[in-house]
């Protein structure tokens, strides 16, 4: 009870601004108006793992004119897939479920938009029974050895 004197004064203060509020443009200009010292510095590469730096010369990469694009499935292969599938009386969805892929994958292969994947091509070859890779595209596949 020693502090309940008539002579003592209790001062209640507001909390200071949070980090997000202190960084705002308004807070900076207000501090400058009050005449406080304001230090602004841009964080550079904060929060990045700098153990692995880029070793390639970026100027050299800029000068390179090589076109970076992926090869697509030729339209010829798409037509062979379509004919083989229709010859077996299958829809795109049926073929997709047989090879455990999405129907969109089959559609992409047939219209020539897909990037060729040897695993998918092999699965399609086995189901429709036609070669899709190599020089004799569209020829019937040789029956493999029975195990």
Curated annotation (Swiss-Prot):
SMART domains xrefs: HTH_XRE
The segment annotated Disordered runs over 1-69
Residue ranges of domain HTH cro/C1-type in the record:
81-135
- What Pfam families does the record point to? HTH_3, MBF1
Query: What GO molecular functions are on record for this protein?
Result: DNA binding
Q: Chief localization class?
A: nucleus
Which cellular components does GO assign to this protein? nucleus
Q: Does the keyword Transcription apply?
A: yes
Composition skew (Basic and acidic residues), residue ranges: 33-42, 59-69
Q: Where in the cell is it found?
A: Nucleus
Instruction: Please provide the record's keywords in A-Z order.
Output: Activator, DNA-binding, Nucleus, Transcription, Transcription regulation
Residues in the DNA-binding region are 92-111
Please list the residue ranges that the record marks as compositionally biased, kind Polar residues. Answer: 46-58
Function recorded in the entry: Probable transcriptional coactivator.
* Name assigned to this protein: Endothelial differentiation-related factor 1 homolog
Origin organism lineage: Eukaryota, Metazoa, Chordata, Craniata, Vertebrata
The gene is edf1
